C-alpha cells in the first residue's frame, strides 16, 4: 500500500492512519469491505465460496458462512449460480458476486472503487439500481469512487469533486448543480441533464397552500413539468411525506432551472 503523505481518516473516533498492522487487519476484516473495478474474484472458487470468503477470514464456521452467503447471493439475483466459477459468468454477474461478498461480512463501511466502470451501460444501470435498492434497507456508509458524474449524481447523497488531488466542492447533488463553486465545476456539470437531476425541492417557493397537481419534494423537474402539462396548469403544489402542502412550483421556474446557464463563447475559465 502507498503511505499517505498527510491527513487523517477518522472512523468512530479512531484514527485509521495511527493503527498498527494488527489493528488495520482487524479493521479491514470487520468494519470495511471493498468492491473492486475488476471484480477481484478467486477464479478457483465457486460463487458460493467467493461470497463466503470474507466470512471465513472473520473466523465464522462453514455452516453459518454458507447460510449467510446464500442470503446475499439471493439478494443480488444469483440464485441458481452458487456452484458456477467466475469464468462461467458475465461481467455483470461477476460484479454481483463481488457486491454480495462485500455485503456478506456486514461491514459498516463499503468502499467501491469505480466498481461499475468496467460494465456496459445497461448492466451498469442495473447494478446501480441493485445498489440503491439495497441501500434503502441497509443504510451503509458507502464511499463510491467514479469518474462518471452522472453516476455520482444518481448514487451519491453527498458528493466531493476533486481536481489535482484537492476537493473543489462538496455537497449534495442539488447544491452542486444549482450553486457550482467555481468555473471548473461549472464546466464540469454543463452537459448534465438538469431536468433529471434537479428536484422540485431545489426551486420551490414555500407555501402552506397551492393549487394544481400535487408532487413530492423529490420529483425531478422533468417529471414535474410533465405533470403540469398533463393537468393543463402553470403551477403545482409540492407536498411533504405527510401529504401536506409545503410549497409551490411554477412551470416558468422549472424551465428556467432546467436551462443550461449561458456561458457565451468563452472557453474554460480556470487554469
For each feature predicted by the language model, list its residue ranges.
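Conserved ABC ATPase "signature" region
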Residues: 12-15, 52, 56-59, 63-81
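ABC ATPase NBD coupling module
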Residues: 16-33, 57, 62-63, 180
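Conserved signature/switch motifs of ABC ATPase nucleotide-binding domains
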Residues: 29, 84-87, 105
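Conserved ABC ATPase signature
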Residues: 85-89, 93-95
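Conserved ABC ATPase "signature" C-loop
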Residues: 165-166
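ABC ATPase "signature
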Residues: 170-171, 179, 248
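The conserved cystathionine-beta-synthase
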Residues: 211-241, 250-271
Amino acid at each position: 500500500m502507498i503511505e499517505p503523505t498527510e491527513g487523517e481518516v477518522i472512523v468512530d473516533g479512531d484514527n485509521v492512519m495511527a493503527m498498527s498492522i494488527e489493528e488495520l487487519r482487524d479493521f479491514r476484516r470487520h468494519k470495511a469491505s471493498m468492491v473492486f473495478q475488476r471484480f477481484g474474484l478467486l477464479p478457483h472458487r465457486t460463487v458460493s465460496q467467493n461470497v463466503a470468503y470474507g466470512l471465513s477470514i472473520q473466523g465464522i464456521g462453514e455452516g453459518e458462512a454458507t447460510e449467510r452467503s446464500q442470503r446475499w447471493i439471493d439478494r443480488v439475483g444469483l440464485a441458481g449460480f452458487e456452484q458456477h466459477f467466475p469464468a462461467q459468468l458475465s461481467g455483470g454477474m461477476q460484479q454481483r458476486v463481488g457486491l454480495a461478498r462485500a455485503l456478506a461480512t456486514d461491514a459498516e463501511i463499503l468502499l467501491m472503487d469505480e466498481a461499475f466502470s468496467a460494465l456496459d451501460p445497461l448492466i451498469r444501470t442495473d447494478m446501480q439500481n441493485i445498489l440503491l435498492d439495497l441501500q434503502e434497507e441497509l443504510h451503509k456508509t458507502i464511499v463510491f469512487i467514479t469518474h462518471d458524474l452522472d453516476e455520482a449524481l444518481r448514487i451519491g447523497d453527498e458528493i466531493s469533486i476533486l481536481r489535482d488531488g484537492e476537493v473543489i466542492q462538496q455537497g449534495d447533488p442539488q447544491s452542486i448543480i444549482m450553486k457550482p463553486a467555481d468555473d471548473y465545476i461549472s464546466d464540469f456539470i454543463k452537459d448534465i441533464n438538469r431536468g433529471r437531476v434537479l428536484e422540485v425541492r431545489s426551486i420551490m417557493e414555500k407555501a402552506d397552500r397551492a393549487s394544481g397537481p400535487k408532487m413530492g419534494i423529490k420529483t425531478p423537474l422533468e417529471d414535474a413539468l410533465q405533470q403540469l402539462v398533463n393537468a393543463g396548469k402553470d403551477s403545482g403544489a409540492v407536498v411533504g411525506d405527510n401529504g401536506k402542502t409545503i410549497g409551490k412550483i411554477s412551470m416558468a421556474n422549472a424551465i428556467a432551472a432546467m436551462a443550461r446557464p449561458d456561458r457565451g463563447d468563452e472557453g474554460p475559465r480556470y487554469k
